């Protein structure tokens, strides 16, 4: 039985250092899309890694290799069409009942047995997943690599792209419009913030503390809630030691991970952190990792979680 290195942990690591690739909204006139029948199928599209993918009909057996893709599929009403998901898929609840294809390693034999007519892979882990999926590609199974969304707009475009290849383009447009409306409502609550809080986003704990600078989705979250990034002078995802965090003295520290027990207390107990404003003001906050790190339909909820973490008084008004 062959097992191939899968997508999830690597997706997070690659996300830390990869360059952004802008997705292009699909249109009938786009050179990247060729539509046939009125239903939109057969359909030929170009995916995030430049591969031309032909889909003969609206898929009814979809394998999703990463949780964000799965959340999008369910939000588009494709509950029954999803036949396989990763070991880490836990939302919505129905996703947890689907056949598991593996976690850090995916099982190509399990995927094959599901007889998928569409596989949704992810750009951030494609370099390691490609070889394992090659037998399925050779057998004629369409494999669409989804863009590694690094912004709100790219997330919307990803949803629209998945909607297109699954025959749910209208549903995708409706979903995106609803998300945009929710985002606008949250932004409106914080539009008049005068005393902006400085925030340190901590995506992993000791001994390797990672944070997010410019050009990341986390930076856009902070921009949209009228907060300052404590590492706005840095680019992308980077590792930072405790001493540097203390010197930057953030007003709020947001923990976007759940794998360390009593993480908030652990941060407060670090040497020198008793001098940090966030610790003195009891503003070290842990948020739901799944919600804030998956670029998908829960993006507005992620924005709300971060807004409540940074400006609890304003968000509770």
PLM segments and residue spans:
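Bacterial Sec-exported substrate-binding components of ABC uptake systems
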Residues: 2-8, 16-68, 169-199, 249, ...
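Short helix-initiation/N-cap motifs at beta->coil->alpha
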Residues: 47-50, 99-109, 234-242
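A short, structured surface patch at a secondary-structure boundary
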Residues: 61-114, 118-125
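Short secondary-structure boundary segments
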Residues: 66, 123-124, 234-237, 256-260, ...
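Alpha-helical, coiled-coil/dimerization segments enriched in small aliphatic residues
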Residues: 86-91, 210-237
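Proline-aspartate-enriched helix->loop->beta-strand connector
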Residues: 108-121, 141, 242-255
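Extracytoplasmic ligand-binding site segments that recognize negatively charged/polar headgroups
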Residues: 126-131, 147-161, 196-217, 260-263
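Structured C-terminal subdomain patch of bacterial secreted/periplasmic proteins
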Residues: 154, 160-164, 173, 177, ...
């Amino acid at each position: 039985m062959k097992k191939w290195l899968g997508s999830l942990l690597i997706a997070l690591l690659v996300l830390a250092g990869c360059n952004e690739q802008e997705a292009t909204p699909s249109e009938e006139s786009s050179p990247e899309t060729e539509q046939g029948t009125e239903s939109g199928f057969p359909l030929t599209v170009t995916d995030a890694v430049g591969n031309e993918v032909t889909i003969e009909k609206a898929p009814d057996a979809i394998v999703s290799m990463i949780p964000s893709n799965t959340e999008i599929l369910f939000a588009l009403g494709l509950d029954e069409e999803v036949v396989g998901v990763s070991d880490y898929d836990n939302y919505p609840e129905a996703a947890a009942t689907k056949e598991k294809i593996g976690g850090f390693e995916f099982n190509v034999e399990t995927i094959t047995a599901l007889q998928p007519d569409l596989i949704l892979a992810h750009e951030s882990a494609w370099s390691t997943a490609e070889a394992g999926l090659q037998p399925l590609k050779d057998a004629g199974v369409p494999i669409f690599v989804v863009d590694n969304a690094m912004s709100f707009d790219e997330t919307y475009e990803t949803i629209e792209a998945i909607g297109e290849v699954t025959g749910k383009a209208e549903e995708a447009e409706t979903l995106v419009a609803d998300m945009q409306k929710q985002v606008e409502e949250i932004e409106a609550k914080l539009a008049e913030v005068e005393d902006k809080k400085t925030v340190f986003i901590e995506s992993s704990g000791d001994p390797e503390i990672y944070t997010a600078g410019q050009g990341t989705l986390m930076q856009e979250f902070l921009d949209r809630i009228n907060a300052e990034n404590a590492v706005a002078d840095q680019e992308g995802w980077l590792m930072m030691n405790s001493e540097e965090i203390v010197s930057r003295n953030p007003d709020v520290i947001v923990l976007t991970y759940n794998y360390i027990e009593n993480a908030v207390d652990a941060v407060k107990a670090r040497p020198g952190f008793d001098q940090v404003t966030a610790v003195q003001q009891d503003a070290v906050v842990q948020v739901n990792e799944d919600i804030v790190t998956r670029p998908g339909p829960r993006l507005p909820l992620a924005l709300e979680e971060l807004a409540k973490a940074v400006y609890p008084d304003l968000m509770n008004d």
